[in-house]
């Protein structure tokens, strides 16, 4: 039973991430920066958690990098994922040094699409 739930989560990971990215885009248009960043984090972390079957309590950049390498994901895609997370963190905690939110949004879509292609 648990393996069926895990498999279902993995299959739906991209769809769920795209819904979260859609919500993030709405917050971006409304200039609600905190809500935008929250949805970006949920989309990114949720996607890898569901796709790679990593429990939320074990999510870290190191664990995700290791799991992506185990799935034969390119180093470039792994690095792009980490950079996108870093951009979100920078936007949240050091706003003056951060990339524009529209750029972060575009990166989020790109990295999730690349990971979906490579992981399958």
Enumerate the predicted regions with their spans.
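Solvent-exposed, low-complexity, intrinsically disordered
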Residues: 1-120
């Amino acid at each position: 039973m648990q393996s069926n739930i895990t498999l279902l989560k993995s299959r739906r990971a991209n769809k769920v991430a795209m819904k979260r990215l859609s919500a993030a885009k709405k917050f971006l248009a409304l200039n609600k920066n905190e809500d935008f960043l929250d949805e970006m984090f949920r989309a990114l972390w949720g996607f890898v958690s569901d796709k790679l079957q990593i429990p939320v309590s074990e999510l870290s950049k190191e664990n995700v990098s290791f799991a992506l390498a185990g799935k034969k994901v390119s180093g470039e895609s792994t690095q792009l994922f980490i950079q996108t997370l870093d951009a979100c963190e920078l936007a949240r905690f050091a706003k003056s040094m951060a990339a524009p939110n529209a750029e972060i949004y575009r990166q989020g879509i790109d990295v999730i699409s690349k990971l979906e292609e490579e992981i399958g």
